[in-house]
Amino acid sequence: VTDATTPSRHALSDIILASAQCLTAVHEGRSLSDVLAQTPPTLKGATQAVSFHVMRHLGQALEVKHMLVAKTPPVPLLDAVLQVSLCLLDTAMVAEQLTREGKPVRPDWPVYAVHTVVDQAVSAVAGHRRMQSFKALVNGVLRRFTREREAILTRARGNPEARWNHPNWWVRRLRQAYPDHWKAVLSAAQLPPPMTLRVNTRKRTVTQFLADLGAAGINAHAVQLEGIAQGADAAVVLEHPRPVQDIPGFAQGWWSVQDAAAQLAAPLLGVQSGMRVLDACAAPGGKTAHLLELADLDLVALDADASRLARVGQNLERLGLASSHVKLTAADASRLDTWWDGQPFDAILADVPCTASGVVRRHPDILWLRREADIARTAALQRKIVKALWKTLKPGGRFLYVTCSVFPQEGESQAQWILEQYPDAVRLDAPGQLLPLPVDGQAAAHDGFFFALFAKQAAVDNNNAS
């Protein structure tokens, strides 16, 4: 998903209203991507750009709104219109100042003139039956912000949620876990990610694909996270994100969209042709495909969501990797009786469900959908899945535990638990916790991930590990 601004035939008032509807849905616990999927096509691009931007700055918008509006508006949509408009207004004022100083404005920002934001926000409520009577409120709040912005923001940023645009509990946990890096991790989440591709080396070399891109006028470069995994050398980063249909070779299966850190998983397992491999929690299939690009495998791709598993099959077809040796199975990984045939696996990739706290720059609504209690809930689910999967690994086999989380309770704590739970588990070299840290103010090269690799020893009494 890219949140690059897309030209729209709609007035800004329409975009503000659509973005406010998205924000209201997120406040109600719905996924932003699900709501955007229902947005009219001509309005979707601009609404997505604004909605993503608001999600990345929602902590400040919420605090400022609370300061300027004594009582929560009786109409939830009006409350969201104020949050969206205050965010756009602040961005407009910052952009004006940068322009006056001759400094560049971030290309991913949805920038409109200050007077346009105020006028169109008022128009948005004026054209809506349930909000018409609040035109003066919206106008007054926004105009006050333009007059008193500096003083208002100074007060607002006394609240860590407004300062860092993360829930307070999230800030606290990262500060405790990473005293030297928590600020950088929080800052990185507010920068849109680069568009990173994984070259299908069965069809193109990285050099060939870079030449393909160059011929199409697309600037890109190869990237490798040094010294982490042999074979993790197929990542290419585009200078500017663009629709997949505009990139050479999509239909031909030359490449897939996949973050650089996610591309480490398959090489870490060290698979070889002929192995029997399980990709648990496989959807949407990026790591499944990568495994098959590396070797000819007897592979089971497992996922509890049948509709998402269907996407795995579609991806494998596009990449030319579908075969009779690849089995897609819709089942709960923790319930062996529903899917396992009793034949052990040589290698298991357990990319288990998590809070997704490491990918919030891609899905900023996660920040406002998650609750602190979700960490313990997902950690319990992760252990339930690992307990089942370990039984299916043959002695001498490899087990890779993966999450896209930055919370240690879903990462290192789980790795230590595996060692305590299973006397036959031996920990091997793997990256451990990868934090998404910005470089020189630019987006981090990769998302937040955790990797722990284990080998299963033979002839160890494991009766107590159940």
Can you annotate each of these PLM segments?
Residues 1-466:
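S-adenosylmethionine
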